[in-house]
């Protein structure tokens, strides 16, 4: 059901930034109120990222009001906060399709709109890309401006500081807006600071500042006195020393929910030369009390009733794989004080809340710093501790060199608990866990396991933790398990699979949680089904036995076919000279868009019907 835009009379006048810029400045507070209410009503009907967008309503309105988008380039970091941006850039009537199959993309996406300058989803990329755009604009010479919006979490990543360090060195015209929603708006963010921000960003001050530098450049004592005076004025009210040292002119912090102050400050800053940083203070979940109170729970939400302020509880009582991991972590830590668990800012998503509370001295949240997380684990292992890195598949990509250089080459006993392996669903191309088996399988010394259910996941985590001959990865999916009952811990034999169903002619070698679909397909085909368990080392003896006693081998995995587990089987068969038909089923050579996990699996032929259909095509074509 579409939302009646007539209930939002000011928002109705601003379907795109050109129309927004025609509104009188005095109407902007009213526009913000309506935009926030529209966002609430839309996301409550469709699901999606919520709290971040509520916090950036005023900023989004001010940016599109002042800057000449899409001529000026606006770069959003991560993109969770960009729903208001989508609503104001011609996508208002489709916002209720966001994160759905064939709907709006969950993040800014270049193919979707000319207002989306960078495809995002992972954090801390905005300043690097924005710097490139700023240099291109500078050489173009048409007066195009570049603005990057980055949050206080994302700016902690090394890549953001690398970009700022570079920007400070080459001195482009670029504005970085630090959206700081970690603190409440304090007395530092009041009338004095708002006034000072407008003063320091104004043309009179900057003209005097630059003119004074030129006049007194040959009088070092006076030049130094002026510099210290300016630093003292800023230092009384702003924490900008770090950014100034990186070569940025720092303004703020100011109230990110005062749209009129934001608009005037941005208008001033658009005229400034060189690297600029505007620090704004916002509140995640602004304007909706439940989200303000608990922004983590309201970060991404299912459909909900906005009048009750209560998120619906899942009717599925089966534990998620993330919970399986978190509970196992607590069980293992109860018997081993040398266990150290590390997460790069994904405590809730990785199922580590309970562990962080019960074992705070053994828990490390290193922030958005995947590279550091992995090498930090290497240091712990060298020091005699037993580190576990809990990380999403898509984010492990960001620490690939550290896995090789700092872990595998030194053959250190580090356990990687890789969550969200395979199809993740609604977050689309940037978040599917499509590549981990491929990029880990080629690394020497690495042991890789893929459980078929939640009990096997527990056993593999236990096995990997107690395997001290080198690094181990246990890779499991997003979502709930099959309902398998947990069994007492046992260490699995390394590199050994298990036959789950004996059949004829066709053998399905399954890697991971597609096993139930494989068994369902096998019933109709009278096929053998093997739970391979290990991607590396492969159970060579079992694979060769299957090849010798079946006409067709089928490999099944929720990973890219290229370089994945199936490729490993192909390599073994070629190496051993076995001439047998083989069919690799997995993720195709394309980036998989958003949709529900069930929809995507069906589209890619990874459900029972699709598996059966692919096998029949091979058998009878």
Curated annotation (Swiss-Prot):
Biological process annotations from GO: 1-deoxy-D-xylulose 5-phosphate biosynthetic process; isopentenyl diphosphate biosynthetic process, methylerythritol 4-phosphate pathway; terpenoid biosynthetic process; thiamine biosynthetic process
Keyword Transmembrane helix among record annotations: no
Cofactor note: Binds 1 Mg(2+) ion per subunit.
Keywords for the protein's UniProt record, in alphabetical order: Isoprene biosynthesis, Magnesium, Metal-binding, Thiamine biosynthesis, Thiamine pyrophosphate, Transferase
Highest taxon, organism lineage: Bacteria
Binding residues annotated for thiamine diphosphate, in chain numbering: 80, 121-123, 153-154, 181, 288, 370
CDD domains per the UniProt record, alphabetical: TPP_DXS, TPP_PYR_DXS_TK_like
Record's subunit section: Homodimer.
Entry-linked PROSITE patterns: TRANSKETOLASE_1, TRANSKETOLASE_2
Cofactor entry: Mg(2+); thiamine diphosphate
Any one GO molecular-function label of the UniProt entry: thiamine pyrophosphate binding
UniProt: Mg(2+) binding residues: 152, 181
Reactions listed under catalytic activity: D-glyceraldehyde 3-phosphate + pyruvate + H(+) = 1-deoxy-D-xylulose 5-phosphate + CO2
Source taxonomy: Bacteria, Pseudomonadati, Pseudomonadota, Gammaproteobacteria, Enterobacterales
HAMAP family xrefs: DXP_synth
PANTHER family assigned: 1-D-DEOXYXYLULOSE 5-PHOSPHATE SYNTHASE-RELATED, 1-DEOXY-D-XYLULOSE-5-PHOSPHATE SYNTHASE, CHLOROPLASTIC
Alphabetized Gene3D superfamilies for the sequence: 3.40.50.920, 3.40.50.970
Species the sequence originates in: Photorhabdus laumondii subsp. laumondii (strain DSM 15139 / CIP 105565 / TT01)
GO cellular component labels: cytosol
EC annotation from Swiss-Prot or TrEMBL: 2.2.1.7
Protein family according to the UniProt entry: Belongs to the transketolase family. DXPS subfamily.
Keyword Thylakoid: no
Pathway given in the UniProt record: Metabolic intermediate biosynthesis; 1-deoxy-D-xylulose 5-phosphate biosynthesis; 1-deoxy-D-xylulose 5-phosphate from D-glyceraldehyde 3-phosphate and pyruvate: step 1/1
Cross-referenced Pfam families: DXP_synthase_N, Transket_pyr, Transketolase_C
Name of this chain's protein: 1-deoxy-D-xylulose-5-phosphate synthase
Entry function: Catalyzes the acyloin condensation reaction between C atoms 2 and 3 of pyruvate and glyceraldehyde 3-phosphate to yield 1-deoxy-D-xylulose-5-phosphate (DXP).
């Amino acid at each position: 059901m579409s939302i009646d835009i007539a209930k939002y009379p000011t928002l109705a006048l601003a379907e795109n930034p050109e129309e927004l810029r025609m509104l009188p400045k005095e109407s902007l507070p009213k526009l913000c109120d309506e935009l926030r209410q529209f966002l609430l009503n839309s996301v409550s009907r469709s699901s999606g990222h919520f709290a971040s967008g509520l916090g950036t309503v005023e900023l989004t309105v001010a940016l599109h009001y002042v800057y000449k988008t899409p001529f000026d380039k606006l770069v959003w970091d991560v993109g969770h906060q960009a729903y208001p941006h989508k609503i104001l850039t011609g996508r208002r009537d489709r916002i209720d399709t966001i994160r759905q199959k064939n709907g709006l993309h969950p993040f800014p996406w270049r193919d979707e709109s000319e207002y989306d300058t960078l495809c995002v989803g992972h954090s801390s990329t905005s300043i690097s890309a924005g710097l490139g755009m700023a240099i291109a604009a500078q050489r173009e010479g048409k007066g195009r401006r570049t603005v990057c919006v980055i949050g206080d979490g994302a700016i902690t990543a090394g890549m953001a500081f690398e970009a700022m360090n570079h920007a400070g060195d080459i001195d482009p015209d670029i504005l970085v807006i630090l959206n700081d929603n970690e603190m409440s708006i304090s007395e530092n963010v009041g009338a004095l600071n708002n006034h000072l921000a407008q003063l320091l960003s104004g043309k009179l001050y900057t003209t005097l500042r630059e003119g004074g530098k030129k006049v007194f450049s040959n009088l070092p004592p006076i030049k130094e006195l002026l510099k210290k005076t300016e630093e003292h004025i800023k230092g009384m009210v702003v924490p900008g020393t770090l950014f100034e040292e990186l070569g940025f002119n720092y303004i703020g912090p100011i109230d990110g929910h005062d749209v009129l102050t934001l608009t005037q400050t941005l208008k001033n800053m658009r005229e400034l030369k060189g690297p600029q940083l505007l620090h704004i203070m916002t509140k995640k979940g602004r304007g909706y009390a439940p989200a303000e109170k608990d922004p983590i729970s309201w970060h991404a939400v299912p459909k909900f009733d906005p009048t009750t302020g209560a998120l619906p509880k899942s009717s599925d009582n089966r534990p998620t794989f993330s919970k399986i991991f978190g509970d196992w972590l607590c069980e293992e830590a109860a018997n081993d004080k040398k266990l150290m668990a590390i997460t790069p800012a994904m405590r809730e998503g990785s199922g580590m809340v309970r562990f962080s509370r019960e074992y705070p001295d053994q828990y490390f949240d290193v922030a958005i710093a995947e590279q550091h997380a992995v090498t930090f684990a290497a240091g712990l292992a060298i020091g005699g501790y037993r580190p576990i890195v809990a990380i999403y598949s898509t984010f492990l990509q960001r620490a690939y060199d550290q896995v090789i250089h700092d872990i595998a080459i030194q053959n250190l006993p580090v356990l990687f608990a890789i969550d969200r392996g395979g199809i993740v669903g609604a977050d689309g191309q940037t978040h599917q866990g499509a590549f981990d088996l491929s990029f880990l399988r080629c690394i020497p010394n690495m042991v890789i396991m893929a459980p078929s259910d939640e009990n096997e996941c527990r056993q593999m985590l236990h096995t990997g933790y107690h395997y001290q001959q080198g690094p181990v990865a246990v890779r499991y999916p997003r979502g709930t398990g099959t309902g398998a009952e947990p069994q007492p811990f046992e260490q699995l034999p390394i590199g050994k699979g298990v036959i789950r169903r004996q059949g004829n002619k066709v053998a399905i070698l399954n890697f991971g949680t597609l096993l139930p679909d494989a068994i369902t397909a096998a019933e109709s085909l009278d096929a053998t089904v093997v739970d391979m368990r290990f991607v590396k080392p492969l159970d060579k003896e079992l694979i060769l036995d299957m090849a010798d006693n079946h006409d067709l081998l089928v490999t099944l995995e929720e990973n890219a076919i290229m370089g994945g587990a199936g490729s490993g089987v192909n390599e073994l068969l070629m190496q051993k000279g076995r001439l047998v038909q083989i069919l690799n089923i997995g993720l195709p050579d394309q980036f998989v868009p958003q949709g529900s996990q069930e929809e995507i699996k069906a589209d890619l032929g990874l459900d029972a019907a699709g598996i059966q259909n692919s096998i029949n095509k091979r058998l009878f074509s």
